[in-house]
A protein has these predicted regions:
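Bacterial N-terminal signal peptides that target proteins for export
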Residues: 1-7
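Aromatic (Trp/Tyr) and acidic
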Residues: 9-13
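C-terminal motif of bacterial Sec signal peptides marking the signal peptidase cleavage site
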Residues: 16-19
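Core segments of small alpha/beta cavity-forming domains
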Residues: 21-101
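Primarily extracytoplasmic ectodomains and periplasmic/lumenal surface modules that are beta-strand-rich
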Residues: 41-44, 124-125, 195-197
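Surface-exposed, charged secondary-structure patches
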Residues: 76-163
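Short beta-strand edge/turn micro-motifs at domain boundaries
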Residues: 138-152, 157, 161, 175-221
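Exoplasmic/lumenal beta-rich domain surfaces
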Residues: 165-168
């Protein structure tokens, strides 16, 4: 498969990623969204929208769960135990805490084009840097599986065992994680029929794939 991060439909899109008002601070608003999703810092977003801390926290928890599910899918894994899912979420939280991004420019709406913010992102290279080690592990796992080494495991335990090897590799390299060259994305802010500014799901996925890029490979579990 092509290792590619593709977020499923996010429950938080309609409520969370909206803003309105005159003299809209698009740079601050986009930064507040990034801070909420990646840093767990809700203060600015709450100031923009008036959404309660408990609601924003719930939306972020849902987003992290979706992120964990996308992680499993990217590595060809089915549903593991709750403990392994929590471990994936904990890893993602540690990765996202290191996210580096900033708004570098704004382009006002004109001639039918939406208002746009330029967002500079430095990619987290942990997946690319450790791809070879992960590939060796997956190959070894598949060889053992071919000889029925995991035949006595339940499906849940099977995926726990498979994901444990990948998570162990990534967790052991959190301290020496490197960053890629900054990449700038255009983030359109479009008004919906209610006059609310929104960021599309495709744009959120593009941000995610830029911040945490996957190596392109045809190898899977």
């Amino acid at each position: 498969m092509k290792f590619r991060y593709s977020l499923p439909c996010l429950l938080l899109l309609v409520v969370m990623l909206t803003g309105c008002g005159h003299n809209f601070d698009s740079s601050g608003y986009v930064t507040s969204i990034m801070d909420t999703l990646y840093k767990g810092n809700y203060t600015s977003y709450m100031d923009f929208t008036g959404v309660s801390r408990s609601d924003v926290s719930l939306y972020r928890d849902q987003w992290l769960t979706s992120s964990a599910e996308a992680f499993m899918t990217a590595f060809g894994a089915g549903t593991p135990s709750e403990e392994t899912t929590d471990r994936i979420i904990a890893l993602l939280n540690q990765l996202y805490a290191n996210a580096s991004y900033e708004v570098t420019a704004e382009t006002p709406a004109s001639d039918g084009s939406p208002q746009t913010v330029q967002l500079s992102i430095r990619p987290l290279n942990i997946l690319k840097d450790n791809y070879d080690a992960i590939q060796v592990y997956v190959h070894s796992f598949n060889e053992k599986n071919a000889y029925f080494s995991y035949a006595d495991l339940t499906e849940e335990a099977y995926y726990d065992t498979y994901l444990d090897g990948i998570l162990t590799i990534l967790e052991s390299h959190l301290a020496d994680m490197t960053f890629g060259e900054a990449t700038t994305l255009d983030i359109p802010l479009e008004k919906n029929s209610d006059g609310l500014y929104t960021i599309s799901e495709d744009t959120l996925t593009a941000i995610q794939n830029t911040l945490l890029p996957w190596p392109e490979t045809d190898t899977q579990q």
